[in-house]
């Protein structure tokens, strides 16, 4: 495996002080990050999340997706629980990159849904891979998880690298009038597990 650990530092956040662990993929040149909180040792399952980079949602507060809401909620839940992890993977735009994501947004502005936009650009609906999580989790000493996700591919990715996923914890947050159609497409076309009550929730302005 081409993933190597680089360094660890403290990361003060509104929810507490996390540890930030840096990893480098020598094959792709991508730099991935793991955030941890509390003591992860022992046999008890660890609350965690696989989160793919989303500059627009995570840093620019975009309402077109639910990514930023999911990241903040995951960090808050982990801090409240007292222990947990987030694997922050550099796979912008479901793996197509930032500029192609903007191109996809342009197509969505013209009426395409998130899957159709990717396909019109010549990409699969979801280009992400998760093989890098195995060495990251091994470095952190994690083997049993409670995974915060609505995406069955992430559950399967954990199981594929030998993780014991004892529970899938739904993470349905951030629905608003700008991303309602996007969330519906993720449920209908990508198999994301979201309750009907989520789609009936009151719109945020």
Swiss-Prot record:
HAMAP family: RibA. Belongs to the GTP cyclohydrolase II family. SUPFAM superfamilies: RibA-like. It catalyses: GTP + 4 H2O = 2,5-diamino-6-hydroxy-4-(5-phosphoribosylamino)-pyrimidine + formate + 2 phosphate + 3 H(+). GO terms for cellular component: cytosol. GO terms for biological process: riboflavin biosynthetic process. It comes from the Bacteria. Its cofactor is Zn(2+). This is GTP cyclohydrolase-2. The active site is at 126 (proton acceptor), 128 (nucleophile). Catalyzes the conversion of GTP to 2,5-diamino-6-ribosylamino-4(3H)-pyrimidinone 5'-phosphate (DARP), formate and pyrophosphate. Pathway: Cofactor biosynthesis; riboflavin biosynthesis; 5-amino-6-(D-ribitylamino)uracil from GTP: step 1/4. The lineage of its organism: Bacteria, Pseudomonadati, Pseudomonadota, Gammaproteobacteria, Alteromonadales. It comes from Shewanella amazonensis (strain ATCC BAA-1098 / SB2B).
């Amino acid at each position: 495996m081409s993933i190597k650990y680089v360094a660890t530092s403290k990361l003060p956040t509104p929810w507490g002080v996390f540890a930030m662990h840096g990893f480098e993929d020598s094959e792709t040149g991508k730099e991935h990050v793991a955030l941890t909180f509390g003591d992860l040792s022992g046999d008890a399952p660890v609350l965690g999340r696989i989160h793919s980079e989303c500059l627009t949602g995570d840093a620019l507060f975009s309402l077109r997706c639910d990514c930023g809401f999911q990241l903040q909620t995951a960090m808050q839940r982990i801090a409240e629980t007292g222990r947990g992890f987030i694997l922050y993977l550099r796979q912008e735009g479901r793996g197509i990159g930032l500029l192609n994501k903007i191109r996809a947004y342009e197509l969505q502005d013209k009426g395409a849904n998130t899957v159709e936009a990717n396909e019109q650009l010549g990409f699969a609906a979801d280009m992400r891979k998760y093989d890098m999580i195995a060495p990251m989790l091994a470095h952190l000493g994690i083997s049993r998880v409670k995974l915060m996700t609505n995406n069955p591919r992430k559950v399967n990715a954990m199981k594929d690298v030998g993780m014991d996923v004892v529970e899938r914890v739904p993470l349905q947050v951030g629905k608003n009038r700008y991303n309602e159609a996007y969330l519906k497409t993720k449920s209908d076309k990508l198999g994301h597990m979201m309750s009907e009550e989520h789609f009936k929730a009151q719109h945020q302005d």
